[in-house]
Regions:
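A short, Trp-centered hydrophobic/proline-enriched beta-strand micro-motif
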Residues: 137-145
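Short Gly/Pro-enriched turn/cap motifs at secondary-structure boundaries
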Residues: 149-152, 176-179, 191, 216-223
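N-terminal glycine-rich flavin-associated loop
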Residues: 105-125, 151
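A short core secondary-structure module
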Residues: 171-211
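Flexible, small-/acidic-enriched active-site or ligand-binding loops
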Residues: 156, 204-233
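A short, charged helix-loop
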Residues: 225-251
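Hydrophobic, small-residue-rich alpha-helical packing segments that form membrane-like cores
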Residues: 152-153, 168
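Alpha-helical interface subdomain recognition
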Residues: 1-99, 109, 121-126, 133, ...
Length: 398
């Protein structure tokens, strides 16, 4: 595998990541995957994202389009999945989130939470039943871990699965579940007499209800739901046989967080590229906004942080592909890249002036979305504590 791209001819202007020549760090297949997903985002998603964000909708038919694109479970092997490396998956996440965090969230939950939980912990029958349909988008999955009172502390979950003969009966509520109202199957985590276990719950099971959460200011082009389990009866075959304890759902979250390490950079990159184009065309005091020192200082500082985040993301991806990335390393990536992407989106909004509060320009939409990304799949505070534990050997979570 060659990692060297041909030397680029000198240009008069560069896109932010071109200054870092990050394409040189990628092989031809990785560059092709990124270009393919970017084309889909530019032609299919970006022309519609303002309408979807404003109306708080995400068309269900996008699932099959994502499936045809090959991004659903693309980093998994077999069962109709592409089996790409981690860097390719990350690059796809980056391009999707350049469109909107809602698109990357859909793909991330489908592939790294729903499909990954089945792929890693499911029986052969469960894998064969669900993974091919989830890979094509003919079926949609969701992942039920968070509860109304238990987000950063999932060990305290109150969802309970009790034995009744050979069946399981599940009760309680899950909250903030992406794709919940769209899903055909939910991976639900519950307390049992033997500890936390995972279950595959078809969403047409009696007693299962998904209630969409409305009036959101963030992730509006995404479906977020409450899942209610009221005496949901499942056969023994619904249990994920290889999921034992809290480490099982946490390993799924670590997989999804890796996609965020790249994905957040897409939101930051799109914000910055949008703002540079605006600054070059906007006349202020008889010259382009881009010609002022303060403007160039802001653009340069944002470019430095974006490029550093990209280098970190690719480095973590190479580690993941080589020997596996540790959870605290993923915490480093999510903490840094989401934090910096949010700062970039906010700063870009200021450079856009009054125009920046409209949906015509993407930075404020990205900033609103990144407020959610900052919180879900581990708050920044929890990632700081994860890093702190790695540095000191002491857990300060309580």
């Amino acid at each position: 595998m060659t990692m060297t791209a041909a030397p680029a001819a000198r240009k008069s202007t560069y896109a932010p990541l071109e200054l870092f020549d990050t394409d040189r760090l990628l092989d031809a297949d990785e560059r092709d995957i990124a270009a393919t997903v970017r084309k889909f985002v530019d032609t299919r998603l970006k022309p519609n994202v303002e309408e979807w964000f404003e109306s708080a909708t995400l068309p269900r038919e996008l699932a099959k389009e994502f499936g045809a694109l090959g991004v659903l479970g693309m980093h998994l092997d077999g069962y109709g999945c592409a089996g790409t490396n981690a860097v390719s998956y990350g690059l796809a996440c980056m391009e999707l989130e350049a469109g909107d965090s809602g698109f990357r969230s859909f793909v991330s939950v489908q592939g790294s939470l729903s499909m990954f939980s089945i792929h890693r912990f499911g029986s052969e029958e469960q894998k064969s039943e669900w993974l091919p349909r989830l890979a094509t988008g003919d079926a949609i999955g969701c992942f039920g871990l968070t509860e109304p009172d238990f987000g950063s502390n999932p060990a305290g979950m109150r969802t309970r699965a009790r034995r009744d003969g050979s069946d399981w009966v599940l009760n309680r509520t899950k909250m903030w579940i992406t794709n919940g109202n769209l899903a055909d199957v939910a991976t639900v985590w519950a307390q049992t007499d033997d500890g936390i276990r995972g279950f595959l719950v078809p969403t047409d099971t009696p007693g299962f209800t998904a209630n969409e959460i409305h009036r959101k200011l963030s992730l509006r082009a995404s479906v977020t739901s409450e899942l209610v389990l009221d005496n949901v009866r499942l056969p023994a075959s619904a249990q994920l046989p290889h999921a034992v304890g809290l480490s099982a759902p946490l390993s799924c979250l670590n997989e999804a967080r890796f996609g965020i390490v790249f994905g957040a950079l897409g939101a930051g990159r799109d914000s910055l590229e949008t703002t540079i184009a605006y600054a070059q065309s906007r006349e202020v005091f008889d010259k382009p906004l881009s010609g002022f020192q303060l403007t160039q200082e802001k653009l340069a500082n944002m470019t430095v942080e974006l490029g550093k985040g990209m280098l970190l993301a690719v480095h973590l991806g190479r580690i993941k592909d080589a020997e596996g990335v540790r959870p605290e390393q993923v915490s480093l990536g999510k903490l840094n890249n989401v934090r910096e992407a949010l700062a970039i989106a906010r700063e870009c909004r200021t450079l856009l002036g009054g125009s920046g509060i409209t949906l015509e320009y993407s930075p404020l939409r990205h900033a609103n979305n990144l407020e959610s990304v900052l919180t879900y799949e581990g708050t920044s505070e929890m990632h700081l504590l994860s890093i702190g534990k790695a540095l000191t050997g002491q857990a300060a979570f309580r």
